[in-house]
Amino acid sequence: MPVKSPFESSIAKPGQGKVVLSLLAPANPSLSTLTYKYPLKLLTRTPNFVPQSASPSASQPVHLYLLSYGGGLLPGDQIDVSITLEPRTRLVVTTPQGSTKIFKTEASPGRTLSDQSRQTLEVRIGQEAALCYLPDPSVPFKDSRYEQIQTFIVDNTAKGSSRSSLCVLDWVTQGRTSRGENWDFHLWKGKNEIWLLDDPISNTSSYSGDNEEKEKKKLLLRDSLILDDETSTSTPQARNNPPKSLIRERTSPHGVIGTLILYGPVFENLSSFFVDKFTSLPRIGARNWSSSAPAAVEVPQNYDSQVTFTAARVRAGCVLVKFGAANLETAKDWLGGTLREEGSIAREFGEEALSCL
């Protein structure tokens, strides 16, 4: 009779990764699980940073780096990452390669969905746990095809300051501007979902997702972005006479577009900061022309005037920020400047969390 190994079996599929962040008494974060397989690579470190959080139970954040060999994804690459934050843990997720490159998909008559690169991320966040996910932007090369799905499951049984918290940045550029690329890829699809877990199973498996079919969840937010040229390059005629880019028309005049999602008590001040910044912007028709009051002095241009953005509160205090800028440098300066001006991320997670900005 074969003896069953007490150790977890290795990941079978290429590109899969699993991370479980636990907390050892009294408040020492520890990665109880960290596995990955080519072409995915996961690196971690504990920074020399002591959080100055208002929460006395806040633990020291752990940094996780998501990398891929070659700095990008080839056609057919499938990345699947599962992350679990057990109660009171804090995790910073970044991509230290400068950008996530999406390499070209070669045109072929028999092209299928498997020819495009794909990335899936699922994160489970326990009570009083916090995720700060600030990756570098995606850079889709000309003729590339890419899809990503990011799912965040938060514990909805906790109330007040014990709720889960998350900050998620998702942004994409027009391509390699140094080579003249300007939204010349075929497809970029991104979907972000936040689910509220109403009835988690009262054991460790509830955080690892082993009993997902028994869980009671409800959708808090679903945000999708589809950039599709709506053309087929599988025929010689289409390749020789490429149509005008629909993606370029729809994103003009922006060279970068992105989404920032904020939820939970750790990012409550940051959420209010973005909403207040947006509501303070001048509006067309806001001036009372019947008044004899002198016109306001025109303020000098700043990064708020160089970036188009909106900020709105949705259900359960979640804030959704959408932004667009002419180029990556402007977007970085605006977003990085705003996050540093408010100060929550640097205070709770350290300045290293803002490395992509």
Where do the language-model regions lie?
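N-terminal, charged/glycine-rich beta-strand/loop interface patches
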Residues: 2-138, 142
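Broad gene-expression machinery/nucleic-acid interaction feature
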Residues: 14-18, 61, 78-80, 118-120, ...
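Residue-level recognition of well-ordered beta-strand positions that form the cores
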Residues: 20, 65, 82-84, 122-124, ...
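Beta-strand elements of well-folded, non-transmembrane domains
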Residues: 23-25, 85-87, 99, 127, ...
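Short, solvent-exposed loop/turn segments that connect beta-strands within catalytic domains
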Residues: 27, 159-162, 200-204
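A short, polar/proline- and glycine-enriched secondary-structure boundary/capping micro-motif
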Residues: 42-44, 103-107, 143-145, 178-181, ...
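Internal, conserved structured core segments that host functional sites
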Residues: 107, 117-196
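A structural signal for small-residue-enriched, beta-sheet-centric alpha/beta enzyme cores
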Residues: 170-351, 356-357
